C-alpha cells in the first residue's frame, strides 16, 4: 500500500516529463486508445518472475522494459530477493545513470530510466523476524544475501517496518492526507529547482553530482562529527556517504531549513539500516 500511495504525493509531471514518458509508452505500445499524453506519474510493479528483457528491455527489436516504462515515476519490486540476481545486478547502472542501454543484433538503443525504486522484502524466507523464524541462520543469511552490497548502496533509504499492534490497526485517529504531504513535497522541489537553476541536467537533490555536495550539503562541526562517527562505526561506503548527505539535504528542505542540522543528519543515517548487520 505504501508503494502504491507514493506516486500520489509526488509533484505533477512537468510538460517535458510528460512528453518523455509519453514517447516511451508509445514505443512500448501501452498507450490507451485515444490517449495523446501521459499526465500521471507511472507506477509499475512487475512480478518477481520477470525476465531480464521484461525488466530492462529487449526482444529482437529493443523495446523499453519496466524500468524505462517507469521513467519519471515509481518502480515497485515486491519480494525483492525472489527476483533473479542477474536481473537485480544489471539494474545497478540504470540506478546510477538514469538510463539503460540495450544491445541486440538489430542495433543498440539507449532509453531513459530515471525512476524511483521502491522495494520490499521479508526478514526471512518464511516472512517472520529471525527470532521467531523456523529457518536456520544459514538459510536466513542466504536469503538476505541475494541482495548485493553494491545494489543496497544505490538504494537511498532503508526502512524497517515493525509489526503493527492491533490497537493501532483498529484506531480511528486521522492521519495526514496525501494532499497535505504532496504540498510539502512540491514546496521542497521548488527549493531544489531554485538551487539547481544554473544546472539544467539536475532537477532534484538525488541527481546532485559529487562536485556539488560540498557546496549544497556543507556541515557544521556537530553534524560533521556525527557523520564521521557513523561512517566509522557502521563501516559505510563512499556511496552511502553521498546518499546520506543527499537525504539529509532533502529532509532539511522539507522543513524549509537552509542548513543541515544534526537532527536532519541523524534521520538520514538511520535510513541506512541494511548497511548494518541485518535484523540482528
Task: Give a label for each model feature.
Residues 1-32, 97:
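Walker A/P-loop
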Residues 25, 34-37, 86-87:
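Inter-lobe coupling/hinge segments of SF2-like helicase ATPases
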Residues 31-45, 185, 199:
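Long, charged amphipathic helices and adjacent flexible linkers at domain junctions
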Residues 61-62, 85-279:
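Basic, amphipathic alpha-helical bundle interface domains used for macromolecular binding and assembly
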Residues 72, 78-80, 90:
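Walker B catalytic acidic pair
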Residues 75-76, 82-83, 166:
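Residues immediately C-terminal
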Amino acid at each position: 500500500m505504501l508503494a502504491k500511495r507514493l506516486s500520489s504525493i509526488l509533484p505533477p509531471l512537468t510538460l517535458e516529463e510528460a512528453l518523455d514518458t509519453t514517447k516511451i509508452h508509445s514505443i512500448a505500445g501501452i498507450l490507451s486508445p485515444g490517449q495523446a499524453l501521459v499526465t500521471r506519474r507511472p507506477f509499475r510493479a512487475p512480478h518477481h518472475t520477470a525476465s531480464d528483457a521484461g525488466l530492462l528491455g529487449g526482444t529482437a527489436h529493443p523495446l523499453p522494459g519496466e524500468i524505462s516504462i517507469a521513467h519519471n515515476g515509481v518502480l515497485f519490486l515486491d519480494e525483492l530477493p525472489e527476483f533473479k540476481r542477474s536481473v537485480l545486478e544489471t539494474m545497478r547502472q540504470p540506478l546510477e545513470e538514469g538510463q539503460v542501454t540495450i544491445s541486440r543484433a538489430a542495433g543498440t538503443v539507449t532509453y531513459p530510466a530515471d525512476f524511483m525504486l521502491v522495494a520490499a522484502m521479508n526478514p526471512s524466507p518464511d516472512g517472520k523476524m529471525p527470532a521467531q523464524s523456523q529457518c536456520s541462520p544459514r538459510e536466513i543469511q542466504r536469503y538476505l544475501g541475494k541482495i548485493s552490497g553494491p545494489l543496497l548502496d544505490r538504494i537511498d533509504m532503508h526502512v524497517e517496518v515493525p509489526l503493527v499492534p492491533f490497537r493501532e490497526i483498529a484506531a480511528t485517529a486521522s492521519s495526514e492526507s496525501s494532499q497535505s504531504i504532496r504540498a510539502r513535497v512540491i514546496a521542497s522541489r521548488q527549493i531544489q529547482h531554485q538551487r539547481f537553476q544554473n544546472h539544467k541536467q539536475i532537477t532534484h537533490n538525488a541527481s546532485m553530482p559529487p562536485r556539488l555536495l560540498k557546496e549544497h550539503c556543507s556541515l557544521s562541526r556537530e553534524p560533521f562529527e556525527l557523520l564521521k562517527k557513523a561512517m566509522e562505526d557502521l563501516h559505510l561506503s563512499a556511496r552511502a556517504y553521498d546518499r546520506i548527505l543527499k537525504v539529509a539535504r532533502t529532509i532539511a528542505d522539507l522543513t524549509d531549513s537552509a542548513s543541515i542540522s544534526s537532527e536532519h543528519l541523524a534521520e538520514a543515517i538511520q535510513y541506512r539500516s541494511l548497511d548494518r548487520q541485518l535484523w540482528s
